[in-house]
Amino acid sequence: PLHDINPLRLEWIVQQAGGSLSGLNVVDVGCGGGILTEALAKAGSATTLGVDLADKSLQVARLHALESGAPAKYEKIAVEDLAARQPGHFDVVVCMEMLEHVPDPASAIRACADLAKPGGTVLLSTLNRNPKSYLFAIVGAEYVLKLLPRGTHSFDKFIRPAELARMARQAGLDLQGFMGLTYNPVTQQYRLNPNDVGVNYMASFRKPQ
């Protein structure tokens, strides 16, 4: 599914960053195998750093970057540690599909806010917590359609948009808007949908100047 939603995410990220990543410093927090990181690097950002704590994922990411020639750098470091080392360094901070897997999402959001420059953009994505998301993201994706390995998600870790907005506000960020990502099992296609944040959704925040 990541390969399918990547172009949609990238389009939205570039849009939120003002229409271009050219000359911007970008960090991809919880980058995994670097699918999005690499796309961000190829989209013209000045520097693109992917950070994660999973050795295996970073190995895949580095290898792929070597093969593709994408100017992305990768590092094994916790987002909180990176924020302590490079506060206010990044124009765009991206954290996709990570918050529902960490023990303390509020801490991760605070660190993302700290990484952003004043006036910078912080873009987060996660899964809504409601009966529909349980049906689609767990029963559908993990058991019926087998898009993901069983046990990938814990429903109680899903985050409602209002909860995400509250944590971001407490971290000093201003909400710019939400964007849903919907999946059609018949056409097997994802699309951006601002009117449906029922399952997968992204949120855009600005750090005040």
Q: Where do the language-model regions lie?
A:
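Conserved alpha-helix/loop element of class I SAM-dependent methyltransferases that forms part
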Residues: 3-24, 39
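Conserved SAM/SAH-binding beta-strand->alpha-helix loop
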Residues: 54-56
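A short acidic, Gly/Pro-enriched loop at the edge of an enzyme's catalytic core
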Residues: 83-92
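A short glycine-rich, Lys/Arg-flanked "PGG" loop and its adjoining helix->strand segment in the class I
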Residues: 106-118
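Conserved class I S-adenosyl-L-methionine
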Residues: 123-145
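Acceptor-substrate binding/catalytic loop of class I
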Residues: 146-163
